[in-house]
Amino acid sequence: TILEDFIEAHPDFSYRGARGTIAVTGYNGIFGYRTSDYWYNWNCEYFDQQNAEERQRMYYNNENIEADKAAAKEIAAAMKELGWTIASHSWGHIYIGSSSYGRVCWDSDMWEREVAPLVGGTDIIIFAFGEDLDGWQGYAADNEKFLYLKQKGFDYYCNVDASSEHWIQIGANKDYFRQARRNLDGTRMWEAVMSYTD
């Protein structure tokens, strides 16, 4: 790839050979493969029957789902071997701050059930839509969503915040590391080219 070729030519480009962090959801599969039993396996025993009509209308039964899972698992292993880190972006690309506690728990359980076995798990969660679990002061000790995600093994929490160049926060009990990130996506690149942002 372009990045791997560049790093090979410039080994001082990254610290200890580190690459980037790729955050994946799960509801639509991973790495281009339809790996979600919930949506693509009509024999899924944990499918929520209230969504059956929507599922029939929007998705198809993936008869190759096990082969797709194996291929996605190979990609994750190869990326990690090269130095990439894989993070959770939530299973359903949810609004984590405004979602109910129950929804956050269900979504986290689904990521653990459908994605973690393919990517090997992670301790990083990158929130969708720039939302966060709490205000800038830090995660409150009684924040149920934080406590649940912490129980799931997450130690690193990242939102989207380009209000300043960078910022980090370490929990009062050193129980989490929180940081802002800049979304390097098509929208951000377009805004930079059009001089709307830095």
Name each region found by the language model.
Residues 1-134, 163:
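Metal-dependent polysaccharide deacetylase catalytic core of the NodB/CE4 family, i.e.
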